[in-house]
């Protein structure tokens, strides 16, 4: 860092430079958004001033009329966006403007693919905000003063976006922020009142602050329009959510979504409702068309804004919606909460609990409408919703007991019914196809669809034509631990506990199984002795029709798949041993009944194969290979 007089020269972090280059390249085809982003920042600054002004009216400095001004200068080739919002101190400029790189920046950059359309969406989700100015400007000058600080505490930030920026302390009479864009050579088309007004009305008409521009008047002498001193408001400057629904176009709904969500695509669906009665509030809630890159970061909750009587209060969505709906964007505006409400009061507020419950009801209702609609457009939207947010919605089964049945009804899975990759099977679909004598909903969990489809546990179910749900999302182990039944039918893992097919198994089969258990009792006891602490026990199975053996967890033990998931997350896994179940009709098992010399090797190979078949890892792969090679060599030498 160099210091010369009052000017500091500082460098961007390397990742920030890279992100700036990527952003300018990826977003250039949608360059108009620079104005939307800068107006959004100005609007946020006004919201913050209103909020802080509730407890300290002196911050208004005798200038309570909040507005945003847009101006341009053809000769200087500049566009200026200014506001009289909260402004920034020197440290806030460094924190908010001087530091573009935030946690996750490196991982975010690595996720970019070179596909311009996809990368533009990802960059929008990451939040470019102020830095979108560099799409059209080769130099940006920001001058600001925080409300409450004296005029000599102004700060000027300047950068060409190439790797460094300068900071200096300046005199600034008015509070707020002014951003001057020095346009690139090929951006002169933006130096037009008509063009700027068009962009403002397209992207920022819903901003509740007036956006002011000077009028242009015709000058007879020069035969051209000239900028006058008279000002006018360009946007509607009214809260879109407070207007009647029939006065709002779909395009206006979409543009407001892009403003609150910092997205470039229209949303998938929205719900706009005015709630009256004990509680009075307005909801305008959106479901995005794609998941944000940080969807699985449960700590990041800034999608939903709370307003009280049109005054922004907070965007801590945890108080307003449960974690499993963290993808929802939009606003809630209450007429009942006191304006000076604190976050602590909100945490304990029954009014907030009521608003939260009402919002959950609306969002689930919106998803249900898509799921049950006869319209192909809505059906396609639900498919997109499930693909993007289905795993997160599954969290609700554990988190939201009061809505568990509604959430369960929305869940979608793959199954052995058609075995397609897309998750389209609902629990109601499964129940409708159950055999008349079937009492349970059968499922299997695995770490991937292929692993689930090829599981040996499915063999008896395929033979009998019984459908099994194939659960292969990481969240599914948590889901099934919290969803024990649905519509009066219990859910049963086919890889845990004793196999109980109930009325699906006839008396002849039961008698045959009992006889086989007796016939193989000596063999199973001998195998248990050889395998020792690797297994809880060895027993005859009725699950298998083709494979020689499989592993089964005890009823109340953790499944092998869950144990592997926890281990991969670095968590401690409680000790539990599986049952080894062997197929009495398989040639390998029948041979083992009469094997003496290589009995231990055959027993270990059956166990290791069963472990591999369920996706497990061998503790000693070298011993497995040695045993297998010995047995193969023995067969070759014996001519078998």
Curated annotation (Swiss-Prot):
Keywords: ATP-binding, Chaperone, Cytoplasm, Nucleotide-binding, Stress response. GO terms for molecular function: ATP binding; ATP hydrolysis activity; ATP-dependent protein folding chaperone; unfolded protein binding. The keyword ATP-binding applies. Residues 344-564 are annotated as: B. This is Chaperone protein HtpG. GO terms for cellular component: cytoplasm. Gene3D superfamilies: 3.30.230.80, 3.40.50.11260, Heat shock protein 90, C-terminal domain (1.20.120.790), Histidine kinase-like ATPase, C-terminal domain (3.30.565.10). Residues 1-343 are annotated as: A. The keyword Chaperone applies. Homodimer. Belongs to the heat shock protein 90 family. It comes from Nitrosomonas eutropha (strain DSM 101675 / C91 / Nm57). NCBIfam families: PRK05218.1. It is found in: Cytoplasm. Molecular chaperone. Has ATPase activity. HAMAP family: HSP90. The lineage of its organism: Bacteria, Pseudomonadati, Pseudomonadota, Betaproteobacteria, Nitrosomonadales. Residues 565-640 are annotated as: C. It holds the Pfam family HATPase_c_3.
């Amino acid at each position: 860092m160099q210091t010369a007089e009052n000017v500091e020269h500082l460098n961007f972090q390397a990742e920030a430079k890279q992100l700036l280059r990527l952003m300018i390249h990826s977003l250039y085809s949608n360059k108009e958004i620079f104005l939307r982003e800068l107006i959004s920042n100005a609007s946020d600054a006004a919201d913050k001033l209103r909020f802080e002004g509730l407890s300290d009216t002196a911050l208004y400095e005798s200038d309570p009329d909040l507005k945003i001004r847009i101006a341009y200068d053809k000769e200087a080739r500049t566009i200026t966006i200014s506001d009289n919002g909260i402004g920034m101190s020197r440290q806030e400029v460094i924190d908010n403007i001087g530091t573009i790189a935030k946690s996750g920046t490196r991982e975010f950059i690595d996720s970019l693919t070179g596909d311009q359309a996809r990368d533009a969406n990802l960059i929008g989700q990451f939040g470019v905000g102020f830095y979108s100015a560099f799409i059209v400007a080769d130099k940006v000058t920001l001058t600001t003063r925080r409300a409450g600080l004296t005029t000599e505490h102004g700060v000027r930030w300047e950068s060409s976006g190439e790797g460094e920026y300068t900071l200096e302390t300046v005199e600034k009479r008015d509070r707020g922020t002014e951003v001057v864009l020095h346009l690139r050579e090929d951006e002169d088309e933006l130096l037009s009142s008509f063009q700027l007004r068009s962009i403002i009305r397209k992207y920022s008409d819903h901003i509740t602050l007036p956006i002011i521009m000077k009028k242009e008047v015709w000058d007879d002498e020069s035969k051209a329009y000239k900028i006058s001193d008279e000002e006018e408001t360009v946007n509607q400057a009214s809260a879109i959510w407070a207007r009647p629904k029939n006065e709002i176009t779909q395009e206006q709904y979409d543009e407001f979504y892009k403003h609150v969500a910092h997205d470039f695509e229209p949303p998938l669906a929205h719900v706009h409702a005015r709630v009256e009665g004990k509680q009075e509030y307005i909801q305008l809630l959106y479901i995005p068309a794609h998941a944000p890159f940080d969807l699985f970061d449960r700590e990041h909750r800034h999608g939903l804004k709370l307003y009280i009587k049109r005054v922004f209060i907070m965007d801590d969505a945890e108080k307003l919606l449960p974690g499993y709906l963290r993808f929802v964007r939009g606003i809630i505006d209450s007429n009942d909460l006191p304006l000076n409400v604190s976050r602590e009061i909100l945490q304990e507020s029954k009014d907030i609990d009521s608003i939260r419950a009402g919002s959950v009801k609306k969002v689930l209702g919106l998803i249900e409408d898509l799921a049950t609609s006869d319209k192909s457009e809505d059906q396609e939207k639900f498919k997109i919703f499930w693909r993007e947010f289905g795993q997160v919605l599954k969290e609700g089964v554990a988190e939201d007991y009061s809505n568990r049945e509604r959430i369960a009804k929305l869940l979608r899975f793959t199954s052995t019914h058609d075995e397609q990759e897309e998750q389209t099977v609902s629990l109601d679909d499964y129940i409708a196809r159950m055999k008349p004598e079937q009492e349970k909903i059968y499922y299997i969990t695995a770490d991937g669809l292929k692993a689930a489809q090829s599981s040996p546990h499915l063999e008896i179910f395929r033979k009998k034509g019984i459908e099994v749900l194939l659960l292969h999302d990481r969240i599914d182990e948590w889901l099934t631990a919290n969803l024990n039944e649905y519509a009066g039918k219990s859910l049963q893992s086919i890889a845990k506990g004793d196999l109980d097919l109930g009325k699906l198994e006839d008396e002849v089969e039961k008698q045959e199984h009992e006889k086989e258990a007796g016939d193989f009792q000596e063999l199973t006891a001998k195998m248990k002795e050889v395998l020792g602490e690797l297994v809880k026990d060895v027993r005859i199975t009725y699950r298998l029709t083709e494979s020689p053996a499989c592993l089964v967890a005890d009823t109340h033990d953790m499944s092998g798949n869950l144990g592997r998931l926890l281990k991969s997350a670095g968590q401690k896994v409680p000790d539990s041993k599986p049952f080894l179940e062997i197929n009495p009709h398989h040639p390998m098992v029948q041979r083992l009944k009469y094997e003496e010399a290589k009995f231990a090797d055959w027993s270990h190979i059956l166990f290791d194969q069963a472990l591999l078949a369920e996706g497990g890892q061998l503790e000693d792969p070298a011993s497995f290979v040695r045993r297998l090679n010995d047995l193969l060599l023995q067969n070759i030498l014996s001519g078998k």
